[in-house]
Amino acid sequence: MLIIPAIDLKDGKCVRLKQGRMDDSTVFSDDPVSMAAQWVDAGARRLHLVDLNGAFAGKPVNGEIVSAIAKAYPDLPIQIGGGIRELDIIEQYLDAGVKYVIIGTKAVKEPAFVEEACRAFPGAVIVGIDAKDGMVATEGWAEVSSVSAVDLAKQFRDAGVSSIVYTDIARDGMMQGVNVEATAALARESGLPVIASGGVTNMDDIRRLATVADSGVIGAITGRAIYEGALDLREAQTYCDSIA
């Protein structure tokens, strides 16, 4: 299981939001590239980048920073989400050295786009499913739909999706612990590899997630916990390696 540091980009800076609220952000660094360097030095094997401005604007806003991080670490798999709603944007990111793109809102509103993207860019597409009480949220979490997370994931089982990033938005940035049961259930019922996100707080969460790795949980994204020191990235990754 991979422990994946999150670098959330807002106005060119590395921030964390609480429950997706743009007006409730904490700036962790003015230099996201040096932030990436810190996590690479701590043993990160993949980075999770989010263009927060892009998620709300519906198109990339912090693309230059994403490209700079990809250029600085050409051998490091990077996944990017936020405002990816066109095939040419996916192409731009992949050309810049990003390995995976995360399709969120567009996957809910236009599932055929995911299939089209998977055909055009095999192995590079991740679907981001953000859920509140099991129901999918879109538009930077501003809207909650009538589609369940499990039903949405099942739609993409045969599309060629690389994995699902599943975020429980009630827990994101709140340091309340990860929703292990819902994450494992999504992996089992969809048959797709799932990366957990939202609420990864400490080593207890990592240990609990590791117990369901056999269900198809292949990674955990962590943000606030590693920035504030509640979780040590190297310790968490070493633990996961030791039980694999």
From Swiss-Prot:
A GO MF label: 1-(5-phosphoribosyl)-5-[(5-phosphoribosylamino)methylideneamino]imidazole-4-carboxamide isomerase activity
Enzyme class, first EC level, given as a word: isomerase
Enzyme Commission number(s): 5.3.1.16
Pathway(s): Amino-acid biosynthesis; L-histidine biosynthesis; L-histidine from 5-phospho-alpha-D-ribose 1-diphosphate: step 4/9
Recorded catalytic activity of this chain's protein: 1-(5-phospho-beta-D-ribosyl)-5-[(5-phospho-beta-D-ribosylamino)methylideneamino]imidazole-4-carboxamide = 5-[(5-phospho-1-deoxy-D-ribulos-1-ylimino)methylamino]-1-(5-phospho-beta-D-ribosyl)imidazole-4-carboxamide
InterPro entries with a match to the protein in the record: Aldolase_TIM, His_biosynth, HisA_bact_arch, Isoase_HisA-like, Isoase_HisA-like_bact, RibuloseP-bd_barrel
CDD domains, per database record: HisA (cd04732)
Cross-referenced HAMAP family: HisA
Entry protein name: 1-(5-phosphoribosyl)-5-[(5-phosphoribosylamino)methylideneamino] imidazole-4-carboxamide isomerase
Gene encoding the protein: hisA
